[in-house]
Amino acid sequence: MSVTDYNARLYEKMKAEQDKYRDWLLHQEPSEILNHTYEYIVGHNDGNVYPNGLISRAETATVFFRLLKDEVRDGNLLTSNTYSDVPDDYWANTAISTMTGLGIVQGHSGTAFDPEAPITRAQFAAICARFDTGAGGTTQTFSDISGHWAEEYIRRVAGLGWIKGFEDGTFRPDAYITRAQAMTMINRVLNRIPEENSDLPAGMNTWPDCNPCLLY
């Protein structure tokens, strides 16, 4: 299936299910849908993406930096910051500096970002909430987030259907998020919700360590 055919098929599906794709601009033509499709992850040099591994705070800032519209990124681009642990020559400096300037990511303090540390589920949910500030969904909560600093962020993105908790009713906000969980959450933010393999475009990037039979 060509990208054009895929866009046309997705466009018709989105019109038929507008409640699910409520954040998309459904007045657009199929050819324009591609403008809202971003390649935001890159595998490792060995060709794997390590879905069950952790994602660092620097990697997270870079992913959301790539998701910015070009005009937003270009108009707010920063190459310096106040973090002592993110020097100008750090590989993710521009992403961290820009996303901090936009208020989407935050450091542990004004002078420390801890870029190589893995990111927690609460921190990731908060970034998703700051990245898309549109209308909220239904109220939803979990048994272990009352009084947590990210409670309102978590409740909002859960109500929008972007994040899921665990079967025991917990969210485990301070647990680290896996790469697969993070990408699943981002895809929900972007309304990339393929229901079957035929919904996926031909020629899409794949990784040998991602089992197509698994939920992610």
Segments (PLM) and residue ranges:
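BZIP DNA-binding basic region
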Residues: 2-13
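Feature responds to low-complexity, polar/acidic, surface-exposed segments characteristic
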Residues: 16, 23-93, 102-122, 129-153, ...
